[in-house]
Structure formats: C-alpha cells, structure tokens
Amino acid sequence: SNSSAASDVYKRQLYDNGRVNTSNIDVYHRPVDNSDPFQTDILVLSGKGEDEFMARFNYKGFRYVEVTSTNPLVLNENNLTAYFVHSDVPQKGMIHTSNALINRLWWATNNAYLSNLMGYPTDCPQREKNGWTGDGHFAIETALYNYDGITVYEKWLADHRDEQQPNGVLPDIIPTGGWGYGTDNGLDWTSTIALIPWNIYMFYGDHKLLADCYENIKRYVDYVDRTSPTGLTSWGRGDWVPVKSHSSKELTSSVYFYVDTKILANAAKMFNKTEDYKYYSALANKIKNAINDKFLNRETGIYGSGVQTEQSVPLQWGIVPEELKRKVARNLAKQVEAAGFHLDVGVLGAKAILNALSENGEAETAYKLAAQDTYPSWGCWIANGATTLLENWDLNATRDISDNHMMFGEIGGWFYKGLGGIFPDPENPGFKHILLRPNFPSGLNELEARYQSPYGEICSKWERKKNRIVYHVTVPANSTATFYAPDNVKGERAVNLEAGKHILELPIKRAVY
C-alpha cells in the first residue's frame, strides 16, 4: 500500500544481535494489551513523499532508537533528530580540574540531573519518570551548586504539602496517583519536606519555602516522635542498591529523624517560635544521644558493624561527638583503603561518604575514591562509556539497571565542597558570608570552581607549583569570606577575606611517613 506503519522504540541497551534490549523497562511494565507499547511511537506514513513527525506530548529516555516498518524504508542517521529536553534552569556553577575523569564525571552528573528534571526531579527519564523523594534530596546540593532551580523546588514542595496526610505522613513518590503511603516511605526518603527548604535557605538566603513548609515539617516530625518515642526508628527504605554490605536501617533512619528535627528547631528559632525551639532542640539532642548510646563504640570509634555507610552517615549529619570525629573518620578511611579505595555503599552512603572523609581530615582518601575508575566506583561508569549516572554500581547487574539515574549524584556537589571548598555559612546564608574550606589532595594539580551566588560569582581556584599551592579567590561585592587552611599546608589556619580578588601562597607541608 502507499501508507506503511513505522514504529520507533526508544531504549538504553542493545542485545548482541543489535536489537534493542527492553529488559530494564519490561521488569516493571504491566501493559493491558499491545495497543500502546511503552517508550514507542507508532506513525502511519502518508505515502506522498517525505513525512515529518515529532512526539510533542511525551518524552523518552534512551541511548538507542530502533525503527521497524511494515514496508521497506531507506533511512540513515540524518532522518532522526534527538532533542534534549528538561526544565529551563540556568547554569550557576562550573568545575574544571587537571583530571579528565573528574571533569567528565561532573559533566555526566549534570547530564543525569537535567535528564531527570521535568517540572520536578525524577528518578529516571525512561522507566518510571516518578518524583522519588529520596533521589530528590540526595541530589539537592549538586542541583543548587550547578543550576538555578529554586522555582522547580518551590513547586515540588507545594506538591509535598498537597500530598501530606493529616497525620504527617508523606508518600515516597511526589506527586502520586495514590501509591507510596504504605510502603517504606520513611525518613531516608521523605525527609525532602525538611531538607529541600533548608538547602534553598542555605543557597539563596530565602526562608520563604521554609516558612511555607514549617507546619508540614512539624506534622512530619511529630508523627515520627509519636510512633518512635525512644528517638530511634527503622522507618525507611535503607541504603538502597548497596555494593555488598548492608547497613542498619535503624541507624540511618534515626539519623534522618535527627536532621529533620534539627532543621525544625532552627526554623522555630528563626521564626520566633520559642516553645517549638525549646521542644525540638531537646528532641534533637534526645535522638542524637539515643543513636550514639545504641550504635557508637566510644572506645573504638566504630558505629554499628563499621561498614562504610554506617561510619559515613553519622559523620555527614553531625551525630558524632566532636572529640571522636577524627577517630570515626580514620576508621572510615581505613575501610576505604582496605577496599582498594573502592565504594561499598548504597544511596545513603553515596550521599555521605565523600563529605564525611573530606570534612574530617581524610581528603586524600576522599579524592582517591572520587577519582577511582575501577569497580565499584563512580568513575568506573565513566571509564566504561557512560555519559550519565547509573542506577547500579555493577555494570553486569540484571535488575535496577537504568542507565540514567540521579540517586548516586551527590558527587557533583562534592566537587564544589571537598575540592573547591565553597560552602554557605548557616549564620549568614545565601553566601552573604562564604566559608572557604578547600582541600589540595596530592593526586590533583589544578582545580577551578566557580559559582554564581546571589551576590555575584565566587571563584575558588588553585594550582600546585613545586612545594606550594597558589590559591586564587574571588569574593563578590557585598560578601565576605573566611578561608580555612587544610591540614597539608602551612600558615594561618583561618584568614578573613573582603570582597575582591585574592591570591594566597600556601607552602605544602612535607609528608611524614
């Protein structure tokens, strides 16, 4: 006939015979019949010369497109055009280093983030396209260092307020058609209600979202307080898709309970809610003490069984007593060294591990982990051709095998923090005052981190020159900064910097073995 039907199937992997591999989607897809195949466009050609078609009412995540036709067609790559679509968020940050793997990893992380930003943050652009709460807050710092996304998150938190039940419970996908209330929709995922408004406040100095969500955070914390009167809770999904070691869900969920309660107490103080401030400050201390009493061995500096996630999460979120931080971090570094500078974490550990190391005197180990290119690591994906982040550390896994996922995406924010050292100051948020805590790991010779703050561009740039680090800093107008020197350089430990450009020459301490 004159008109033939062609179908385009959009997929992420190929079988050995060159056909598209749909297993990543088929494992979850439950079609009623074959009339509306998933990630597939069906078009009837006119038979009157060249036809043009663009799918305007959906989007797909894919690496390969397979075209099949009822009648023979002559096609080449010029007949198909792919458009990269995502929410319109201006770029705010830039990372460039002397390590090509790090540069490409930063780029791939941003690709994954944008692929998963379609009105709200999603888990993956091909299989579910759902607003998984955990994925959203694991990546929030990466998001805000790289992109001006405040309006996306204001909208998403309005969805949170709409979806919250009267008792305080949130579903673990938002928005939802009703699924996600009776699952493991606990603290390690649905803490978005507190973590995202707090991070918006840190990065923008704007507390409106925190104010809008105050009663919702309170209802959420009160629900957990009622159901977990000891301060310990196992409500959550746990360290999802770990390499091999499993962590205590009670430890990690209780840490997020602490974080939410601490954010609520800080917000209460800010909004002059004196009674709330007293109550939730006391509750936060109770939770912290309960965690340390149950899980911390104060003699050895080990949490739980001492696996990477159990050591990392308490360090990242301020649970570890001040006098034990270095000891706990050293134990974590030993674990990483014993694993050959490889990861043994799931999503909760991936969020915490680099920060836990680099902010507690173990930046060398953090950098070796970030720059690792063999399994299991972030860099292993890149070394094997990935242009986004994956859902599974194992390239040969048979489930949880999306090739475009954001849940392991904290590393993109860590480059600004652990290497560039650009941090907002909780006392003067929105980068009115900037905390500069860069690290100069021996394996890296140059780093440049730029971030467009509300006051102008912050630049933290350093290069290694023989026995010293030359550190260039730009502090924007109407801002100030404090530079904190890392352990491996000589000189003043803290230097206050006014607006303008500064060059600091920092002699490197000789390593003692």
Regions found by a protein language model. Give the residues of each.
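Non-catalytic C-terminal accessory modules of carbohydrate-active enzymes
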Residues: 364-513
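A generic structural motif
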Residues: 4, 60-62, 72, 262, ...
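Helix-terminus loop motifs that line ligand-binding clefts
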Residues: 14-33, 150-246, 374-395
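Alpha-solenoid helical-repeat scaffolds
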Residues: 133, 187-190, 207, 251, ...
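Short Gly/Pro-enriched turn/cap motifs at secondary-structure boundaries
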Residues: 184, 304-305, 403-406
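Extracellular/oxidizing-compartment recognition motifs
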Residues: 1-127, 134-135, 151-154, 171-178, ...
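Catalytic cores of carbohydrate-active enzymes
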Residues: 94-96, 110-112, 125-140, 144-147, ...
